[in-house]
């Protein structure tokens, strides 16, 4: 199989001669240059002939998920311990583990005008799925957080958003449905129930149903 290390290409920050889109000049640790202490693959590349990236790929390389997610981030001492996650952490949009209000959070920040932080957790293919998690926003007057549910090909069927207007909303079809307002610094327990058979998502916040929306793309699982 051919597996992507990074398949998403950000806009070019600036133009120039002989510049091409996408990851280029990929390099690994060649024979004779030593062996990584962690035994993993380390690959570097240039994105759009601008930023230089370093990717750590856990060995053995796995393409299938063996179990569903049940994470307690307080169990991890550092971000590198989250080997079940795919983490995309630009310099100006870093992903980190931080302590806030007595809890350890997987934290996404962003001040990059051309790129954004991204974390992915692959799970076994499911036609019926219930996902629950705690969420806390650092602000509600700028920035956007998107939570998407994807199939095995990376096609998103549903999306929950925190908008820069302080609204939690869900995308259904070609439209968005506002569900509630959210406040910065407040912890919300979100539960999403997805059904491929019914082609919809039901969302609850702190045990209270806030909306139901149809998938905006057909998926098999």
State what each model feature region is.
Residues 2-33:
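Conserved blade-ending motifs and adjacent loop-strand segments that build the rim/top face
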Residues 15-16, 117-123, 176-182:
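Beta-strand-rich interaction surfaces with strong enrichment in secreted/lumenal proteins
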Residues 23-67:
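Blade-level signature of beta-propeller repeat domains, shared across WD40, Kelch, NHL, RCC1
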Residues 77-105, 115:
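Extracellular glycan-recognition surfaces and repeat-rich motifs
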Residues 100-172:
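Secretory/extracellular carbohydrate-interaction modules
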Residues 131-133, 185-196, 201-203:
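Short tryptophan-centered beta-strand motifs in secreted/extracellular beta-sheet-rich domains
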Residues 169-191:
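Short, aromatic/His-centered strand-loop micro-motif at the edge of beta-sheets
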Residues 204-220:
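Short, solvent-exposed beta-strand-to-loop segments that form ligand-recognition rims
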């Amino acid at each position: 199989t051919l597996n992507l290390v990074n398949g998403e290409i950000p806009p070019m920050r600036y133009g120039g001669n002989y510049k091409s889109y996408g990851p280029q000049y990929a390099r690994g640790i060649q024979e004779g240059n030593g062996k990584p202490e962690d035994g993993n693959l380390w690959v570097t590349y240039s994105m759009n002939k601008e930023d230089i990236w370093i990717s750590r790929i856990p060995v053995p390389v796995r393409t299938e998920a063996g179990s569903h997610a049940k994470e307690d981030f307080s169990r991890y001492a550092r971000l590198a311990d989250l080997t079940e996650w795919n983490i995309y952490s630009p310099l100006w949009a870093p992903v980190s583990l931080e302590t806030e209000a007595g809890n350890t959070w997987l934290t996404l920040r962003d001040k990059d005008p051309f790129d954004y932080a991204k974390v992915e957790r692959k799970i076994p293919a499911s036609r019926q799925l219930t996902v629950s998690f705690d969420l806390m926003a650092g602000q509600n007057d700028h920035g956007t957080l998107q939570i998407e549910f994807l199939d095995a090909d990376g096609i998103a069927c549903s999306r929950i958003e925190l908008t820069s207007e302080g609204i939690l909303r869900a995308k259904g079809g070609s439209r968005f449905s506002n569900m509630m307002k959210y406040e910065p610094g407040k912890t919300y327990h979100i539960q999403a129930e997805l059904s491929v058979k019914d082609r919809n998502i039901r969302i609850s916040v702190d045990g209270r149903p806030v909306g139901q929306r149809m998938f905006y793309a057909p998926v098999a699982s």
